[in-house]
Amino acid sequence: DQARFFRPQGVLWVGERIYVADTENHALREVDLQSRMVKTLAGNGRQGHWVQSPQDGKLTQLSSPWDLAHEGGFIFIAMAGLHQIWAYHTETGKVGPFAGSGYENIVDGPLGEAQFAQPSGIAISGNYMFVADSEVSAVRRIDLAHKVVQTAVGEGLFVFGHRDGPLEEARLQHPLGVACEGNRVYVADTYNHAIRLIDLAEQRVSTLVGKPEMKTVCNIADPSCDTLGLFEPSDVKARGSLLYIADTNNHLVRIFDLEKKVLRTLAVKE
C-alpha cells in the first residue's frame, strides 16, 4: 500500500508474481503476491538511452517500457522509447537489447539489424513473438528459433488505413496491443477503433470488432452501450473463446465472444 507507479501500461502474471511495465517511471517492477511487496528489477526512474549489451538491471536506465511477455527464463520488454525489444533475465538480473538496432523504421532481418518503430505490444506463441509496431502501423513476427524479424502486416511510417484482405494488402493504423493463439493473431488496432484478426494459416486480415465510421463514446449508464463501437482500444487478451479488450477512451473493459460474435461490457462482479 506504499508503493507507487507512474502510468504503467503492461502487466504480466507469472506464478505468484506480477511484472509491471512502469512506463513513465522507465522501470520494470515486480509485485510479489505472497509477501505483498513491490520492487524494481530494472530502471532507476530516469529515461535511458541505447545500450549495446546486457547490464545489471538496477544500474540500467530504460525508456518507456510498454508491454511484457515471458518465455524461458526471460521477461521480454517492448521498449517503445528505444524502438527495440529488450530481455530481462530472471536469474541473473541483467537486462539489455534482444531485437532491434535502435533506429526507427520497418526493416526485417537478423535480430541486431532489424528496425522497429515504437513497439508497444508483444505476445508469444510457440517459437514466435508478435509485436505491435505502432508508428509503422505494423505487426512484426520474431522467429525465436532462427533469430530473425519478419513483417506480417504493414509497410512503413506513412502507410496506414483500415483495409481487410491478404496480408500484403491489409492496413492497420497505430496498433498498440497484440495477442496470439496458434495461427491466430488478435490486434488492438487503436486508431481504427477496432480489433483485427490476422489469420496466418489463410494469410488474411479481417475485422472482428469495430468499423471505421464508429467512433461514438460509450456511456456505461446507457443500456445500449454494448452496441456502440470501441474508442481507441489499447490492448487485447485471448482466453478460450473470449477476447478481453482494453477499451481505453471509453474507460471500459469489453468482452467479445468469438463464437457468438457478441460484444459486451465487463461487469464489475465478473
Question: Which functions belong to the PLM regions below?
Answer:
Residues 32-36, 89-93, 143-147, 199-203, ...:
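Short loop/turn segments that connect beta-strands within beta-propeller blades
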Residues 15-16, 72-73, 126-127, 182-183, ...:
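Short coil/turn segments that connect the beta-strands within blades of beta-propeller domains
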Residues 26-29, 37, 83-86, 137-140, ...:
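A short loop-to-beta-strand structural motif that recurs across blades of beta-propeller domains
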Residues 1-9, 37-64, 94-118, 148-176, ...:
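Gly/Pro-rich loop segments of beta-rich domains
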Residues 237-270:
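Blade-level signature of beta-propeller repeat domains, shared across WD40, Kelch, NHL, RCC1
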Residues 20-24, 77-81, 131-135, 187-191, ...:
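Conserved beta-strand positions in repeat-built beta-propeller and related beta-rich domains
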